[in-house]
Regions:
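Binuclear metal-ion centers of metallo-dependent hydrolases, dominated by the metallo-beta-lactamase
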Residues: 16, 61-139
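Short, hydrophobic beta-strand segments that form beta-sheet elements in well-ordered domains
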Residues: 52-56, 106-107
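Binuclear metal-dependent hydrolase catalytic cores
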Residues: 1-54, 119-139
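A general structural motif
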Residues: 34-38, 55-62, 85-88
Length: 139
């Protein structure tokens, strides 16, 4: 091989089966893929340590909720107030956030139908927020 060419090892990702990612300095974190549904299409969300990233979700099988217990941070989609056939609306996202019970929840993947950020944010519980471009979250 040529110097500097990265070596890649492909690993199969299996929903519900954790794997470890890390860097050369030895920092490692466990990642657990989660089954979620984008309408009728199965996709994956991820629990990454004490944080989870779930986007493009409409529904999630009941067993996956068990894998999300004890989260500090949940990042999840909330498209708009009205129902949609492939994404959670605001009520569905709020219901799922309450069921999961993370310390803080951040909604992403919102459309302009959600309204102005400051106005819409006032409708959320204190531990739930609309994320924004450039936002930083401490883990």
């Amino acid at each position: 091989l040529y110097p500097g060419v990265p070596r890649i090892t492909l690993e199969e990702i299996v929903p519900g089966s954790p794997f470890i990612i890390g860097n050369p300095e030895g920092n490692k974190v466990e990642v657990t893929p989660l089954r979620v549904m984008h309408g009728k299409l199965p996709i994956l969300g991820y629990r990454i340590g004490k944080m989870a990233w779930i986007t493009d979700m409409l529904t999630m099988p009941g067993a996956e909720y068990d894998l999300l217990q004890g989260l500090d941070v949940l990042v999840m989609n909330a498209l708009r107030p009205q129902p949609h056939n492939t994404h959670q609306n605001l009520k569905e996202a709020l219901d799922n956030a309450q069921r999961i019970g993370a310390g803080e929840t951040y909604f992403i993947h919102m459309s302009h139908h959600m309204g102005l950020h400051a106005d819409a944010e006032r409708l959320l519980p204190p531990h739930v927020h609309f994320a924004y471009d450039g936002m930083r979250i401490s883990l």
